[in-house]
């Protein structure tokens, strides 16, 4: 049996040369990223960052891998189905970069954000849990952390919410302001989903790329979120790029409102100007009303 050569971080990142300088590579190696939700988008972002050479991660996810995850979650395989996502993902990362420093958090991680966030200025939100996401955003503002996220949309998207930016619940008009995240009911959660869906319809071509009946079920909480590998993995890749920019102090063309990447037309869709958005919102409200009827 051939002996495996010893791992070399420098050799692993050799092909990064030209994209980042040696000094920037050292910055990535010393960088820290908190990823909550390491399934689809979060898992894709995480794998890209590991292979880019980021050296320190804190990971949180309460779920186990299921067969239905295998259509888009990079760490879901026949070997990991039935295993806790955090443990299985850590094992996979160790097979890529055994020098990566991994800190894991249990089901109570939301309660420990005051301890987690001071050490992380870059956070990737890969969760579907809306209430936990609201708690994350509130605490990120307090601790000066930037949250990279994406919309619930059939198109790849990415948002970068810096500490001074409005939270999604403020910007999108969620009915959760002033409510403890633990007290967010399913009805409130569905109202938040509807508010997000309205923004997505107004500011992107998403409505042209999804089955409306299925989307209505998602908003109503009667259907699980549809996920397609190219969309999910592309979204995770966009998130990883934004994390790299933040770690390296590079400028980004993405703000708290985000952008959509339409792979069907190869266009970048940005927030629409106010007069156009005003007209489209009225159309979108009628569309949502028909969808929910």
Region spans (language model):
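Beta1/beta-strand and adjacent pyrophosphate-binding region of the FAD-binding site
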Residues: 30-38
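Aromatic pocket-lining residues of Rossmann-like dinucleotide-binding sites
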Residues: 49
């Amino acid at each position: 049996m051939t002996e495996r050569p010893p791992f070399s971080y420098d050799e692993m990142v050799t092909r990064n040369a030209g994209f980042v300088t040696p000094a920037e590579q050292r910055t990535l190696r010393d960088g820290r990223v908190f990823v909550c939700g390491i399934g689809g988008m979060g898992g894709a972002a995480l794998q890209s960052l590991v292979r880019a050479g980021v050296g320190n991660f804190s990971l949180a996810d309460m779920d186990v891998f299921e067969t239905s995850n295998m259509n888009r979650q990079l760490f879901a395989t026949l070997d990991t189905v039935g295993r806790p996502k955090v443990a299985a993902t850590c094992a996979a990362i160790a097979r890529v970069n055994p020098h990566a420093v991994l800190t894991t958090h249990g089901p109570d991680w939301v309660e420990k954000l005051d301890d987690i966030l001071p050490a992380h200025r870059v956070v990737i939100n890969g969760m579907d849990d809306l209430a936990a996401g609201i708690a994350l955003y509130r605490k990120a503002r307090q601790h000066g952390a930037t949250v990279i996220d994406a919309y619930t949309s059939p198109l790849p998207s990415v948002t970068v919410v810096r500490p001074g930016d409005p939270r999604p619940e403020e910007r999108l008009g969620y009915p959760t302001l002033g409510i403890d995240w633990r007290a967010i009911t399913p009805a409130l959660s569905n109202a938040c989903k509807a508010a997000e869906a309205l923004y997505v319809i107004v500011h992107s071509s998403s409505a042209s790329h999804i089955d409306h009946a299925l989307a209505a079920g998602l908003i109503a909480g009667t259907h699980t979120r549809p996920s397609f590998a190219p969309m999910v993995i592309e979204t995770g890749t966009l998130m990883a790029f934004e994390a790299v920019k933040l770690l390296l102090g590079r400028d980004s063309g993405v703000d708290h409102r985000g952008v959509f990447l339409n792979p069907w037309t190869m266009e970048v869709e940005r927030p629409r100007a106010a007069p156009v958005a005003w007209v489209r919102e009225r159309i979108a409200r009628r569309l949502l009303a028909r969808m929910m009827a």
